[in-house]
Amino acid sequence: MRNLSNADLAHLLDQPIFHHLSAVADDLQLECYVVGGYVRDLFLERPSNDIDVVVVGSGIKVAEALKQRLGKQAHLSVFRNFGTAQVKYRGMEVEFVGARKESYSHDSRKPVVEDGTLEDDQNRRDFTINAMAICLNEARFGELVDPFDGLLDLEDGIIRTPLDPDITFSDDPLRMMRCVRFATQLKFFIEDETFEALQRNRERIKIVSGERIADELNKIMMTDHPSRGFVELHRCGLLELILPEFTLMDIVETRNGRAHKNNFYHTLEVVDNICQHTDNLWLRWAALFHDIGKPRSKRWDVQAGWTFHNHNYIGSKMIPGIFRRLKFPMDSKMKYVQKMVDMHMRPIAIADEEVTDSAVRRLMNDAGDDIDGLMTLCEADITSKNAQRKQRFLDNFRMVREKLDDLKERDYKRLLQPCIDGNEIMEMFHLQPSREVGTLKQTLKDAVLDNKVPNEREPLMALLIEKAKKMGLDVPQK
């Protein structure tokens, strides 16, 4: 984070879009401020093309005036029912709203809105770090307005609400998810009173639509260390309401002195591991769900101890129901996660034994195009604290990958090798090894490589005969 004076802020806002905003606001004699995430990210040195503007008065009027000033390159959208507008210009999105104050009923997160002051608007913001504003009017251009010491919280790495957190979260329960999400994204801590309010108000999450919750979960999942967010959701009690199947994994049971590992924290370790190697959202979710079937499959065996037989299959059958409840897409993405969960034990079984061509080929055939993702998941699943055992698995997985690459290369070459070879050409045209044979072989190979003909006998034979005739060779009669 950097320390910025008002003069520094004015310098950073010395961009055409902000000067245009300043000019139209002054022409309309309206106070105009850039607020929220854009201001926060200026201090954090995080690039942003999304600009939120609050106008004390009509935000729509300022948006319309800005569009007129910018001309055809700007695109204006007006949402009069909500009193908001948006201008898109050269890759930037500027959102406009009039300063307002809000009140809520207990059974809805949709507020009753009325016109207000900048102070009213800052009061309704979710967190102090998002409640800072910078004036854009020429006389005060670059002046920071920070009534809740959001800058101090930004410096200290704290997530805190501007007003009473119980009111903040009860009024709009989605803010509880946003609280955890910001803490995860920014690697901040949730202030104690704010966290306690999360615990007290967790049941209010039930009035939030599944789509909104899913959006916040996905944002947590796309951070560098999603485990931080899921631990916070678990600690405050939200996770039990959103993903009860996952919280059931937070248990260690001991019998006859034999215990199984805590699969909740093992899973979070796997998720963090996989995030170092992929930005694929659904592969990350597959990592979170890979052992989701363990609580249902757990059995005690006097000889073997704790077992989780078929937990991969049981877990894969749970995925559609979880996706449906979370309002996740019920399409190829769901089937991909289901497939990864079902197959995640296969490479481990191969790596634990002798790595044979036939076993790897069966794996490659069953996994298809998803083989690389499956291998990435399985490598992330190695969390053993036994360094020797962990290294043995890593070495074996490396052998599996090498075998996969070798088989892919061999299959690729076989696929591109014309099914009519040189020996058949020589026999067909009564030739000895010669330049003519090489020319005919190359003709077939080029045609296959360039995808001009399929690598099938009949079309290749027709091409071969055509080329032989052009070369003046004796073509055998059928």
Residue ranges of model-derived segments:
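Catalytic cores of the polymerase beta-like nucleotidyltransferase superfamily
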Residues: 1-478
